[in-house]
């Protein structure tokens, strides 16, 4: 997983890539305008961020820009959530995906939100955990965001069901969400009505389409 660089880190990466390309280099050959302590610190951060490869002690090589940038879009949120040791459940559009058995998917590699409900008392723990794991997260609706991220939705209490191995809000809550956002989630409503026998306002056209997926 690649993380974004500071201006100074990116300047050093650019210099290293222009000078060495994919060739190996040592710290001594890259001292130019930086003191040795500062250079060691920056090189460590570049390596930790996924922009440099450590070949052996004190010897590095630049990761290609293409590979480094593609690292921004590597999926890791779901696996991290499983290791959080904190209570949560998928909600809203993420719950719609789960209850529809992924026949409806609202995510893509370039825009991949996960909506999770968490206990309000745990919000500081969630912030620390997600920062530690390098996962982008928001507590309000984000704007101008790409890639994978988690939208935290704090709650005083929550009911957690399980479906296909995922902790998810109860089906009736997902139906309510989909009804309130019917223009986007009518297919999910139709799937739910066909699969679980729950009455919804899905049209016959969508009911027929969803029936084919079950």
Positions of PLM-derived features:
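Short gly/ser-rich loop at a beta-strand->alpha-helix junction or flexible surface loop bordering the NTP-binding
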Residues: 58, 71-153
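Short beta-edge/loop segments at beta->alpha junctions of small alpha/beta modules
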Residues: 1-90
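Hydrophobic alpha-helical interaction segments
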Residues: 128-214
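A broadly conserved detector of short glycine/acidic/proline-rich loop/turn motifs that flank catalytic sites
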Residues: 66, 120, 156
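Short, charged/polar micro-motifs that form catalytic or ligand-binding hotspots
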Residues: 32, 36, 116, 165
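Exposed alpha-helical structural elements
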Residues: 11, 68, 72-76, 94, ...
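Short, flexible beta-strand-to-coil junctions
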Residues: 55-56, 118-121, 178-183
């Amino acid at each position: 997983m690649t993380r974004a660089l500071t201006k100074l880190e990116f300047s050093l990466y650019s210099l290293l890539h222009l000078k060495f390309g994919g060739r190996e280099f040592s710290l001594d050959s890259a001292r130019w305008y930086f003191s040795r302590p500062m250079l060691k610190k920056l090189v460590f951060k570049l390596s930790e961020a996924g922009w440099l490869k450590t070949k052996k002690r004190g010897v590095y090589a630049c990761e290609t820009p293409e590979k480094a940038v593609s690292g921004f879009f590597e999926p890791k949120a779901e696996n991290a959530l499983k290791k959080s040791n904190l209570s949560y459940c998928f909600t809203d559009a993420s719950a719609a995906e789960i209850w529809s058995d992924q026949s409806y998917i609202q995510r893509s590699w370039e825009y991949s939100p996960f909506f999770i409900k968490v206990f309000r008392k745990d919000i500081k723990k969630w912030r620390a955990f997600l920062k530690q794991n390098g996962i982008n997260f928001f507590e309000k609706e984000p704007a101008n965001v790409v890639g994978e991220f988690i939208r935290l939705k704090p709650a005083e209490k929550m009911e957690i069901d399980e479906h296909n191995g995922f902790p998810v809000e109860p089906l009736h809550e997902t139906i309510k969400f989909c009804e309130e956002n019917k223009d986007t989630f009518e297919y999910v409503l139709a799937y739910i009505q066909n699969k679980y026998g729950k009455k919804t306002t899905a049209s016959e056209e969508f009911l027929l389409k969803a029936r084919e997926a079950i």
